[in-house]
Amino acid sequence: PTARVTLTPKYDTICDGDNIGVTLTSPSTPTRQVRFRYTVEKPASVTVTPAGPENNLTPGTVLTNQIDNPTDSAQLVRFIVTPYTRNPGDDGEKCTGTNDTVYVWVEPTAAVSVSPGNDTICDGDNVAILLSSPTESTRQVRFRYTHIPVAGVTVTPGAGNNLAPGYTITDQI
């Protein structure tokens, strides 16, 4: 039969510096066990370790490549996996099967930019700190903050959660 590959998961989103976890299996049953090889397609700025190509991988192999995305945008990395049958008596490729692709979005490390409206305020005044981010991820960046208590200073409310870019912190001090 023509060798086929099953990839689990086929689509994934990971954080910068994380490892993938893709299992290679095959429903095909040739006379000798199917083997797999893969190549990687990635943007130039992204690093994949190991970078591939790799071959002679057995069914049940889990790809655990680490992917580093130093940019401020989500990047798509593709792993093209090809199954094949082997020559009798060695592990050389005999018949190439039907390849399939794993699609991995690699999120950037989120960054925050804060812009205070004033650098000096009076007791009882409100701050005006604008939150923004250069990060372009697959989903909108969100922020949370807390203040570090200082003796004799009260900050109200002093914390925030699930804040979108463009939000202005207006705590009273």
Specify the residue positions occupied by each region the protein language model found.
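Extracellular low-complexity Ser/Thr/Asn/Gly-rich intrinsically disordered segments
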Residues: 1-173
